[in-house]
Amino acid sequence: MGSKTSKMCCPQLRKKKRQKAHKEGPSSQELNDLNAKSQGPNELLQKIKEYEQEIRNILQKHQEEKTALADAHKADVEARTLVLQAQAQKDRDAETVKLLSEQAATMKAEMEEMFAELQKSYEQEKSSLTEIHQQLTDALQESVDELNSQLASFREKMKRVEESILSQDYQRHIQDYGSPGQFWEKELQSLHFVIEMKSELIREQDKRLQRHKSTMERSLELEERSRTLQQENEALKVQTQKQGAITVRLSEELLSIQTTLEKQTHRCEQLEREKEQNLYRAVIGDITQQFSLQELPVMVL
């Protein structure tokens, strides 16, 4: 930028030198005329000093123009540097937003996949528990039916005992010992009945105890699995709530970053416009001053 200004100023200097040389020609003629007319050298020396002062002023203005153009070039470089830095920061912010968006999408996909797997496991466990419950219900119904059948069988056996064993024993007792008294006859019948009843009850109770023991074990196992499933379901709900909170927080952070990025972008664009306006004013002012300085020596000469 400085070299261009120097090229612009050099023709002007050469023009001024030619004008000076042209003027110096007549000045030499005037000097000869003055010598011819016997005038003093003081006026000639004064004009030479004025020309030297004019040359120094031109050189000083040229140096000031070079300094102004160098400052304008420096301001332009600084403005472009700020624009590049703002663009780099904008790119970094965009990359950060993109990375956060990808992380949020990945986390959401993982959470949905985990929730789907847990939901599938929950449905399978629920189906298994429903099947087990149905099996237990069927088993209990079978037990009830079996108990009813055993009760009917027991009543039938009781009837047969009354009709067979007691009658046979009673008849044998009568044949062996004769007819007993009414009291002993009743006692004997009661004794046989109680013995048969106790034996049947003991056997039936033993069977029922075994079945109830097996049923209780299966019920306890079912309750334990139900509690485990409920705990896993609660843990799943808590984890889902945490994942939801994390997703909401990430969404809020992403929105905040996007808002900040938009503000920074708007601010960078505003700064860039201000820099361009200031640079434009500075360049226009320097050019105007340059033309003024270039015209001034001609007017003086």
Swiss-Prot record:
In what ranges is there compositional bias, type Polar residues?
A: 26-41
Coiled-coil regions, chain positions: 42-167, 213-281
Give the keywords, sorted.
Answer: Coiled coil, Cytoplasm, Cytoskeleton, Lipoprotein, Myristate
Q: Where in the cell is it found?
A: Cytoplasm, Cytoskeleton, Spindle; Midbody
Q: Name one GO cellular component term.
A: spindle midzone
Location of the region described as Disordered in the Swiss-Prot/TrEMBL record: 1-43
Covalently lipidated residues (N-myristoyl glycine) read: G2
Query: Organism's domain of life?
Result: Eukaryota
Family annotation (InterPro entries): MTUS1/CCDC69 (IPR051293)
**An MF annotation (GO) of this entry:** microtubule binding
Q: Which GO terms describe its biological process?
A: spindle midzone assembly
Q: State the function annotated in the UniProt record.
A: May act as a scaffold to regulate the recruitment and assembly of spindle midzone components.
| PANTHER family hit by this protein | COILED-COIL DOMAIN-CONTAINING PROTEIN 69 (PTHR24200:SF6), TOUCAN, ISOFORM A (PTHR24200)
User: Which family does the entry's similarity section mention?
Assistant: Belongs to the CCDC69 family.
Q: What is the protein named?
A: Coiled-coil domain-containing protein 69-B
Q: Which organism is it from?
A: Xenopus laevis (African clawed frog)
Corresponding gene?
Answer: ccdc69-b
